[in-house]
Each structure stands twice: as C-alpha cells, then as structure tokens.
Amino acid sequence: MDLRGRPKCYSLHLGILPFIVLVLVFFGYGFLSHKIQEFRNPGGETCMATRQTDVQKVVSVPRMAYPQPNVLTPIRNDVLVFTPWLAPIIWEGTFNIDILNEQFKLQNTTIGLTVFAIKKYVVFLKLFLETAEQHFMVGHKVIYYVFTDRPSDVPQVPLGAGRKLVVLTVRNYTRWQDVSMHRMEMISHFSEQRFQHEVDYLVCGDVDMKFSDHVGVEILSALFGTLHPGFYRSRRESFTYERRPKSQAYIPRDEGDFYYAGGFFGGSVVEVHHLTKACHQAMVEDQANGIEAVWHDESHLNKYLLYHKPTKVLSPEYVWDQKLLGWPSIMKKLRYVAVPKNHQAIRN
C-alpha cells in the first residue's frame, strides 16, 4: 500500500497508462495512414470512394411568405420525384424557385453554360443565346462559353448585368460524330485550365435548341443528368445503350436506371471534369480498339451516370422535341426544346 492507502499495483497502472495511450495513438495513426493509402490508385490520385459527396451549404435566408408544404399531400402523384438513391427528379411543381434563388444568390453563385457552335451549327447560336437571356438563370451571374471554329460568326447578343460571353476557338472535324465526341475532351480540358477558376457550376447544352421557359438554379447540384424524352416511359431493355462488350460504353441488358440525354448535363466544375475526362478516355480506348459507341458521347455519358449516380435528375421538361413528341399533359412546361432543322444539310 502507498501512503494514501492505494495498492502499489494501482499506482503502477496509472504510470503505465499514458505510455499505453501513446503507443495506441502511434500505431493507430500508422494503421489509418495505411488504409488511406489503400484508397489511392498507383498514380497517386484519390479514389472515387474518398471524393466529397454533394453537401449543400446551409445559408440563412430572409423572411419570406410562401405556401406551407403539406407532408400528407404529394407534390406530384403522376410522376416519380425521387430516384432509388434519393436524388430528386425535377418536374414543374416540385420546387419553390423563390427560396432557391435566395439560397444561391446568398452564395454568390456563378454558372457557366458551355455550347459548341461548330461549322454550320453556328447558325443556331443567335437564337440559343437570345432565349437563354430570357429564360436561363435569370437574375444570376452567367458566363456563356462558346466553342467554335468560326469566331467571326459569333453574333452580338445584348447581355444582362452580370452576364458575359467568352469565345473559345477550337478546330472542327470532318465527321459530325467526331465533333460530338470531342466535346468531352474540350470540356474536360477547359474545366481544369479555366472553368474551375471562373464559375461554380457548369451546364453543358446543345446549340440547336432554344430555351422556351424557365431554367434556373433548381437544376444545380454536384452532378445532374436529364431524362431523354424518347425513353422516359421505356423499360431498360429498350434503352439504346451500347450493347457490344468490346466498347467501354457497354451496359448489359439487365442493368440501367434511366436513359440520359447527351444534350443537357452538368454539375460542379469538379464533377463535370471527372465525367468528361472519363468519357473522353473511354472514347480514346474504343478508338484504339477499332470500335465506336452506337450513340457516341451520349453512350459514354450513360455508362458514366449508371456507375456514378447523379445527385439530381432533370425531367424531360429540360430536353424536349415538340415536333416529334407533341406536348403530353404530363409535361406542365417545356423548358429547353429542339429547333426544327434538316439534320442532313446541317451535318454535311
């Protein structure tokens, strides 16, 4: 016993305890460091498993008057409004744009919109930009990134406050398929070299379209895709995925969530860079193996979004062809629609 009546072994234990803690901390750190290294590939890049998920910032909004949400009244009972992985599917009636506008304005958000106006497709650019000024991200800061081989043909369109246009000169290709596929390469390159320093989100659209109704911050998320208007009612077996195993875009017939349109996708600059870089690398590998995916960059986009689930999915309101599909009652609004054209004349 010591002078305070405690057993000597008890005092000994108290003396050893700090040493044991130090040993455990040291070896625990080494173990965790080893595990962290296991999540990195041989090239030193962090594996997808360690990437940050879509964490929406919590911002303080001002007092606002708006209808109270009712937990017993579905916002839409005629369509799916959430994916199985709990990503929202954006339809008219599923969001309050006033609340969202306040949230994104308080974050001082800047949105980039990329569009490719190559060869004869430059004729669609004026209508694209004019309608974007009317309907796209109204009230927010926007940078239009126009990729073109004809910079002198880019029209002068009056832009609102906080909005500007940047012309990026790129080469053209003989085949329209190559023009389409090289979009991924260009977006990937400029995301790394420029976009990440200038904008918070990227939206990638087709130039032979026009905005016909509101397209705003409700679409913004870490990674979003848009349901293809021709397949939103179809079963996965009917999707026009790439079905040849030789291609990097191959998807088996028993897999698939949705069929996404190649003409409208986006997200944070980081996630768009990951997507476009992966698709470009897959297309390069296909080319080396003498195969071209059935729907080119769209096929690779669908493969990517199958295994990298988007954090938000846009309904076909955001890509529509009224001439081919009419205006079904389920579509409360048609927001981004195809412009009638002669594909053969434009592509050749």
From Swiss-Prot:
Glycosylated residue positions: N108
GO biological process, one term: lipid glycosylation
Consequence of substituting T53M: In allele A2, allele A3 and allele A4
Keyword Lipid metabolism: no
Reactions the enzyme catalyzes: an alpha-L-fucosyl-(1->2)-beta-D-galactosyl derivative + UDP-N-acetyl-alpha-D-galactosamine = an N-acetyl-alpha-D-galactosaminyl-(1->3)-[alpha-L-fucosyl-(1->2)]-beta-D-galactosyl derivative + UDP + H(+); an alpha-L-fucosyl-(1->2)-beta-D-galactosyl derivative + UDP-alpha-D-galactose = an alpha-D-galactosyl-(1->3)-[alpha-L-fucosyl-(1->2)]-beta-D-galactosyl derivative + UDP + H(+)
Binding site for an alpha-L-fucosyl-(1->2)-beta-D-galactosyl derivative: H228, T240, E298, D321
One GO MF term: glycosyltransferase activity
Effect caused by changing K35R: In allele A2 and allele A3
Cellular component GO terms, alphabetical: extracellular region; Golgi apparatus; Golgi cisterna membrane; vesicle
Superkingdom classification of source: Eukaryota
Biological or metabolic pathway of the protein: Protein modification; protein glycosylation
Active site residues of this protein: E298 (nucleophile)
Annotated positions binding Mn(2+): D206, D208
EC number(s) on file: 2.4.1.40, 2.4.1.37
Record's note on what induces expression: During a Nippostrongylus brasiliensis parasite infection. The expression is a transient event, with a maximum at day 6 of the 13-day-long infection.
Gene3D superfamilies registered for this protein in UniProt: Spore Coat Polysaccharide Biosynthesis Protein SpsA, Chain A (3.90.550.10)
Main location: Golgi
Cofactors named for this entry: Mn(2+)
Consequence of changing K164R: In allele A2, allele A3 and allele A4
Binding site for UDP-N-acetyl-alpha-D-galactosamine: F116, A117, I118, Y121, D206, V207, D208
Entry text on domains: The conserved DXD motif is involved in cofactor binding. The manganese ion interacts with the beta-phosphate group of UDP and may also have a role in catalysis.
Cited function: Possesses strong A transferase activity and weak B transferase activity.
Family statement drawn from the similarity comment of this UniProt entry: Belongs to the glycosyltransferase 6 family.
Protein name in UniProt: Histo-blood group ABO system transferase 1
Gene symbol of the encoding locus: Abo
